[in-house]
């Protein structure tokens, strides 16, 4: 499910797969060939979240903003494992 928050709606590349039970909220950008698994929650209510190319967000993952990094970025070809919680961080090369 895609939700607009604060006037910003998720942007999803047409080649990405988003499970019907996943929730993307606010300023989320999902790149090419990404996978968002069942019951994942990606909540960009405080700042932007960017999933670069071929990122896999597995079942039950929570990613949200609100910390030191102004933009949460998950770099190309990173897999976030089942049930992980990512709070306001950059994952992968800088």
What are these regions (language model features)?
Residues 14, 19-20, 25-26, 31-32, ...:
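Left-handed beta-helix
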Residues 1-14:
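Extreme N-terminal tail/first-helix region
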Residues 49:
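A short, polar/charged loop-to-alpha-helix boundary motif
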């Amino acid at each position: 499910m895609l939700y607009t928050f604060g006037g910003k709606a998720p942007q999803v590349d047409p080649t990405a797969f988003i499970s019907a039970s996943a929730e993307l909220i606010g300023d989320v950008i999902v790149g090419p060939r990404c996978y968002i698994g069942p019951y994942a929650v990606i909540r960009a209510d405080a700042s932007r979240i960017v999933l670069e190319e071929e990122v896999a967000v597995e079942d039950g993952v929570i990613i949200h903003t609100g910390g030191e990094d102004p933009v949460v970025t998950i770099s190309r070809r990173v897999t976030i494992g089942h049930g992980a919680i990512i709070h306001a961080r950059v994952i992968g090369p800088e």
